[in-house]
Amino acid sequence: MTKWAASLIRISNHEVETLQKRLAEITERRMAAEMRVTLLDAEAEAEAKNAEGDPSAGWYMIGYREGSKRRRADMLVQIEQCQQEEAGARDALSEAFENLKKYEHVAEQAKILAAKKMNAFEAAQMDELSIRRAAVGGR
């Protein structure tokens, strides 16, 4: 394999690995946000159950529900942003992987071409050797 092909493949591998790490981080952030929404919903449900038994809790529950709705909406926006970022990262990773495969294919073709040239050169040398032997007298 030629130096330039090895360098391209190494750089492409690095790019693919970097994009895989980025995608993993984005997915982790999205999952954490989804977990926070789940916890927020569970917390709101627990507060509602606690407020059922206390008549004075009705006043603070109004504010609590509004705050909970806002936090939930913020988390849902964050999840949506993560999903969009994740889709972009997946596309970039797919493109980088395609480029890597192209470079590997070009390197393989260059290797095959070099082997064909070497075989043709060896065949020409053997032909020349047999012609010389025939000219000398068949030794």
From Swiss-Prot:
GO annotation, cellular component aspect: plasma membrane
InterPro entries: Flag_assembly_chemotaxis_eff
Predominant location category: membrane
Cellular localisation: Cell membrane
Keywords on record: Bacterial flagellum biogenesis, Bacterial flagellum protein export, Cell membrane, Chemotaxis, Membrane, Protein transport, Transport
Record flagged with keyword Protein transport: yes
Domain of life: Bacteria
Membrane topology: Peripheral membrane protein
Keyword Mitochondrion: no
Record GO biological process: bacterial-type flagellum organization; chemotaxis; protein transport
Family, similarity comment: Belongs to the FliJ family.
Function: Flagellar protein that affects chemotactic events.
Protein name, entry field: Flagellar FliJ protein
